[in-house]
Amino acid sequence: PRAGPQDLLSADGYLFTTPENLATMAGLMKDFFDRCYYPVLGRIEGRPYAVMVCAGSDGSGAVRQIERICTGWRLKSVAPALIVNTHAQTPEAILAPKQIPPEDLQRCRELGEALASGLALGVY
């Protein structure tokens, strides 16, 4: 099942995660925001969020898009965006399955754990 407005309403915080495609968030993530933006507008203000992006070379385009949406929702950023760079620069590398290095996976785990811990302790 796809995530939707009810999932946002029932969550205490959010970890938005997406690959970056052509300097933007992935189409499925954009679809999620398109379907959810207005149904939850005015109903989730102040909730914490963080962003993770997997990119071939940059990632900042997807981060900017998500942060603008979160600003519209009046969410509270609780960590700098985490960008995992795969350095995929050729068509073959871009289309190939990615192997994320353990240190990058650890950074992702730590961000998720920090968000979960902050929520559990009432920090956010």
Ranges and model annotations:
Residues A3-G4, V78-Y124:
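Glycine-rich phosphate/pyrophosphate-binding loop and the adjoining helix
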Residues A3-N85:
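Helix-loop-strand module that forms the ligand-binding subsite of alpha/beta enzymes
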